[in-house]
Amino acid sequence: MRADLVPGAVFPDYELSDHTGKHRKLSELQGQDPMIVVLSRGSYCPKDRRQHEGLLELHGEMEVGYCRLVTISTDNITDTYEFRTGLDAHWPFLSDPRRIIQKDLDIAEYTHPEHNPMIPHTIVLEPGLIIYKVYVGLLVLRPTVGGRSAPGFAGRD
């Protein structure tokens, strides 16, 4: 990840096509709310699929708390649409097959040359695309006291 993208900095206002082909800017998707941006490896990855299954439950809690969610992957629009639909997700999935974000943020995953994905990141943004926290790795559900699942992060922050 670029060294200048730290808490307090402004995250770039990328404009990409969503799962329907419509061009969307991150700032427009965010509005005046906090937002979580998931930089995904893509629909081919079983770990990413599991992460997004967990995000389905979390998304309901986020909506009640006026927090936005967006997923960005290097999948083409067709794969992005199928991934979102297959999950029955109701938040925007953005498609970046030209790998604009991967190159700009310097997050190419060198371990998987066939799909050339991004290293997964989860970025928590305050209103105005201001970075609150950057997590490297996949969001996973971990057990908690009482047997309920709680979100946690695999990787480092």
List where the protein language model places each region.
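Chalcogenol-based redox active-site neighborhoods
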Residues: 1-157
